Amino acid sequence: MIGWAVETLVAATLLMALVLMLRGPVARRFGPHAAYALWALPAVRMVLPPIPDAWRPVDFAPIGAATEPGQVMMFVPIADMPALPQGWGMADVPVALVAFWALGAIGFVAWHVVAHRRFCARVLASGQGRGVAQGHVRVIETRHAAGPLAFGVWKRYVAMPADFGERYDPQEQALALAHELGHHARGDLLVNWAALVILGCHWFNPVAWAAFRAFRADQEMACDAMVLARATPAVRHAYASAIVKSAHGGAVSAACHLHSVNELKGRLIMLSKHRVMSPATRRVAGTATLALAVFGLGATASGTQAAESIRTGVEQVTGVEIAQVERQAAAALAPVADVARMAQGT
């Protein structure tokens, strides 16, 4: 399990770096939807199981000649073997690091869950209802929203700032609402939680943090493109004005904001260069994305030679044998497993 986790984290990091390099050219050539779709590649790799043993190539050792000299092996009786040293030692460091990583991942996700629940409680406690959109999305105004935002997976909300009516003209209000409803329709809120769990597994990884920021930017630009499909220049200008008026620095990671300032330049550039892709271009984009996914996942899946190379490279860099760490972790967790079995028996 630890070996699979190490291979998965390293392979997902490589795929994140690949998407970071490709997202710009892909967005310029095929549009923001294609760039956003690329992020499925590292996400799927995070949950990709190892290749079954039956699918792996089998290496057969050559049969030795009958005249090859035999080998004599000496065994020491168990009673004569020295006892293993007790207590903490350097051999326990890898297991401690694995435990530290797991605690960091759990703590990261738990912190975001608690922070999001507190934010939702503040917004709902101070919010004033402004109706229901699309039959199931409640629209509220609250002083705790710096700009329009969507939140909630099961119970869906769109929160507007308290000065929404004064800050935005009627057309901008309609476009801002359409943007946030678009996030709900696309399932972006659930995707954001999945992205946070993945980031929690990579909490120590600077590549993952850069990938998360880029993923959120691509998500917003893909939603922009959906709202503005075949829009007139006047509508695009009004939409850009709404984005600028919504610019703010703070953001809730699990929510979808109309805008945060670190994405402003890229989104406005995208709005100014909008073009409608032909069906042929969309087919090429879909085919290329699918081919990249098949190649990337197939090349990095656990059980392949590439995955074995990843494991070997990690062992060489760290000087730690992953199989030994797995045995130590299993021994450390054995008492916990025994207690769990006893509890189930009662």
Name every feature range the model reports, one short phrase each:
Residues A159, Y168-L181, A185, L189, ...:
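Short alpha-helical catalytic segment bearing the HExxH-like zincin motif
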Residues M1-H136, V153, F164-E166, T304-R327, ...:
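Hydrophobic membrane-embedded segments
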Residues L22, V26, F30, G182, ...:
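Juxtamembrane interface helices immediately C-terminal to a transmembrane segment
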Residues R186-R216:
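A Zn2+-metalloprotease active-site environment signal
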Residues P52-A54, V114, F119-A121, A178, ...:
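Short helix/loop segments within enzyme catalytic domains
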Residues G147-D169:
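Active-site scaffold of zinc-dependent metalloenzymes
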Residues I2, A83-R117, G147, K245, ...:
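Cytosolic-facing loops and C-terminal tails of multi-pass membrane proteins
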